[in-house]
């Protein structure tokens, strides 16, 4: 079964991206994505 993950910008804490991930993986994901609120590429953490 897959789980829905929402990514949160580390700088402004806005929730920008949504992804699905398997429940078997327990590692935290950190990705570099563009944040439209910060107007730059920032690190995004997953929020279960």
From Swiss-Prot:
Which Pfam families would you find in this protein's record? Ribosomal_L33
What family is this protein classified in?
Belongs to the bacterial ribosomal protein bL33 family.
- UniProt keyword Ribosomal protein present: yes
Q: Which UniProt keywords apply?
A: Ribonucleoprotein, Ribosomal protein
Its cellular-component GO annotations read: cytoplasm; ribonucleoprotein complex; ribosome
Quote the SUPFAM superfamilies the UniProt record gives: Zn-binding ribosomal proteins
The cross-references to InterPro entries, in alphabetical order and at most eight, read: Ribosomal_bL33, Ribosomal_bL33_sf, Ribosomal_zn-bd
Q: Can you say what this protein is called? A: Large ribosomal subunit protein bL33B
One GO BP on record is: translation
Organism of derivation: Mycoplasma pneumoniae (strain ATCC 29342 / M129 / Subtype 1)
UniProt xrefs under Gene3D superfamilies: Ribosomal protein L33
Entry's Gene Ontology molecular function annotations: structural constituent of ribosome
């Amino acid at each position: 079964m897959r789980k829905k993950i929402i990514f949160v910008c580390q700088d402004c804490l806005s929730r920008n991206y949504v992804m699905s991930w398997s429940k078997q993986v327990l590692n935290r994901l950190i990705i570099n994505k563009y944040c439209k609120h910060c107007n730059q590429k920032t690190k995004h953490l997953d929020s279960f």
